Amino acid sequence: MSEPLPIVLIPGLLASARMYAPQIPHLWRAGPVTIADHTRDDRMSAIAQRILATAPERFALVGLSMGGYIAFEMLRQAPQRIARVALLDTSARADVPEQSAMRRAQMTLASQGRLREVLEQQLPRLVHPARRNDTALREVFALMAQEVGAEAFIRQQTAIMGRSDSREMLGSIRCPALVLVGDADELTPPGRAAEIAAGIAGARLVTIAGSGHVSTLERPDEVTQALLEWLQA
């Protein structure tokens, strides 16, 4: 019997392991789970290198939003080590100037001790409209922001602004791929997911009904099921 495949989870911007809290107990039944540290560097290449330095020799990789951007960079650096990849609520495209300008404005607020204000600005776009006043969900976002902190947030935004366009390398991804998106994701809309899936041979595209950008927390059962099916395929 082969050894269980380790699973590495990369959270999104201003997010921690709590982003995957509903999935982690179920994923452990498939293989050992680790949460990547994406808070200490301000370049995508350095973030990917740091994760790869401590990751198992071969593993399944899951990234949501910024985690997906990092996953693309890891696939550039060490494709032979990634046995499977799941790209959730993310995009293969680089920032456009308007996005970078928004990030710089948020970084300024964060540097002034106004990170909570940044989160309040973002929340309406992060979740499905029906969940915008969900107190429990808002509390999870607030706790994650506290865990990451302003300095790491600024490093993360710097890395995101400097990331490469990954569309040209989609065809080089040979491992089993899951591409998943919430049907109401405003930040990385379903069209971005379809673009990724179309570029990766054999990729499975899953759209989660009633979810915005943070599908793991908004529709946890559906996302868990999709991940388990991907791991077993």
Placement of each model-derived feature along the sequence:
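Catalytic histidine-centered segment of alpha/beta-hydrolase-like enzymes
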Residues: S211-T224
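Conserved HGGG/HGGXW glycine-rich cap/lid loop of the alpha/beta-hydrolase fold
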Residues: S2-R50, L64
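Gly/Ala-rich beta-loop-alpha elbow adjacent to hydrolase catalytic centers
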Residues: G63-G67, A71
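Short beta-strand/loop motif that positions the catalytic acidic residue
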Residues: I173, V179-V181, D185
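Flexible "cap/lid" loop of the alpha/beta hydrolase fold
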Residues: M44, R76-Q77, R81-E120
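Conserved alpha/beta-hydrolase "acid-adjacent" motif
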Residues: E186-R192
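Catalytic histidine neighborhood in serine/cysteine hydrolases
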Residues: A194-H213
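Conserved alpha/beta-hydrolase catalytic His-Asp/Glu region
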Residues: D95-E98, G113-S172
